[in-house]
Amino acid sequence: MAIVPKFKVIEGWEKLPKGYVHKDVDGVATDSQDRVYLMTRQDARVIVYDRDGNFVRSWGEEIFTPRTHGIAIGPDDFVYTVDDGDHTVRKFTPEGKQL
């Protein structure tokens, strides 16, 4: 039997800076500090929030193709992304430095 997580929508949780938008979110992950990472196809970037929905940072604008496909956080808090536009899996620090 598969274990399926349950999610609850919290209206107004996400607080993006002015000018930031996103449409296609193809991955969501959390790290050990309860930061939430969205992998978006809009501007091909990762957007990071704190647990209360406050914007922390974004990164990846010059790295990804418009066909990003997923994101995961390892037990060491490294960020792993999948991009099927260039058939890559990449590893990053939580701050967005590619390793």
Locations of regions flagged by a protein language model:
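Eukaryotic scaffold repeat domains enriched in small/polar residues
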Residues: M1-L99
